[in-house]
Amino acid sequence: MKKNSSDFCFSNERKAQLSEFLENLSIDFNNFDLLNTALSHSSYSNELDQKSDNNERLEFLGDSVLNLIITDHLYKTYPNKSEGELSKARSYIVSEDSLSSIAREIDLGSYILLGRGEESNDGRNKKGILADAIEAFVGAIYLDSGFLIATEFVVGLFDMYIRLMFNRGDFKDYKSLLQEYVQKKYKISPNYKLDKEIGPDHDKVFCVELYVGEKFISNGKGKSKKEAEMRAAEVALKAMEDINL
């Protein structure tokens, strides 16, 4: 459920919401003031007093932390990839499109504090706001728990996207591209439904169906639900212009 940023300041209610967010991600956090700042957009702080913090400084820090973690992970995990391939992969992973897509995956937008103007303009779904917030969140994790914990979080969140990129041989985020296309053309969002799981627990394959409205569009399979959704989105996007919804 979306949180109305004009309804509260940093109250017990807000702490409960932040606790819910952390629980969903299985993350421990010591400094809730720091976490709250990471999820406070400048439009929100501007509506309060000048002493109120926003996430711009944490975004600045998190951008560098995120780049280092991704660079280190790519270098160590893909020793046979060239410098050019690694640079291209890193640029894609830390792009606004990728960061905003990952932010949507963890429902980050629901916990961002926004000013009334951004709230009314669907700021929770804006790529720039989501990408900035996830950078600020990474910066906050780094300050709160150190580089190792920040690395574990980032790698756990991003590794599937990196593996998909190299496996497909391209650097497109089909879920984000499909969502933009469908929202622009039909004013709704695509819906992914888990159809079935095949195989033993140690080698499970997930089968996902993709719908636009009530209409079935495509399906996809993968070693995780996210991978299956990405593959379903890829099929749908390539066929969408030929489908009469």
UniProtKB/Swiss-Prot annotation:
Main location, first listed in the record: cytoplasm
GO BP: mRNA processing; regulation of gene expression; rRNA processing; tRNA processing
Keywords: Cytoplasm, Endonuclease, Hydrolase, Magnesium, Metal-binding, mRNA processing, Nuclease, RNA-binding, rRNA processing, rRNA-binding, tRNA processing
Annotated InterPro entries: dsRBD_dom (IPR014720), RNase_III (IPR011907), RNase_III_dom (IPR000999), RNase_III_sf (IPR036389)
UniProt cofactor(s): Mg(2+)
Gene that this polypeptide is encoded by: rnc
Domain RNase III per the UniProt entry, residue ranges: 18-146
SUPFAM superfamilies xrefs: dsRNA-binding domain-like, RNase III domain-like
Catalysed reactions listed for this entry: Endonucleolytic cleavage to 5'-phosphomonoester
Taxonomic path: Bacteria, Pseudomonadati, Spirochaetota, Spirochaetia, Spirochaetales
Entry superkingdom: Bacteria
GO cellular component terms, A-Z: cytoplasm
Name of the protein: Ribonuclease 3
Intracellular or extracellular location(s): Cytoplasm
Gene3D superfamilies: 3.30.160.20, Ribonuclease III domain
UniProt-annotated binding residues for Mg(2+): E59, D132, E135
Enzyme Commission number(s): 3.1.26.3
Active-site positions on this chain: D63, E135
Function text: Digests double-stranded RNA. Involved in the processing of primary rRNA transcript to yield the immediate precursors to the large and small rRNAs (23S and 16S). Processes some mRNAs, and tRNAs when they are encoded in the rRNA operon. Processes pre-crRNA and tracrRNA of type II CRISPR loci if present in the organism.
Annotated signal sequence range: none
Protein family according to the UniProt entry: Belongs to the ribonuclease III family.
UniProt enzyme class: hydrolase
Organism: Borreliella afzelii (strain PKo) (Borrelia afzelii)
Pfam families linked: dsrm, Ribonucleas_3_3
Single GO term (MF): metal ion binding
Assembly and oligomerization: Homodimer.
NCBIfam families linked: RNaseIII
Residue intervals of the DRBM domain: 173-242
PANTHER family for this protein: RIBONUCLEASE 3, RIBONUCLEASE III
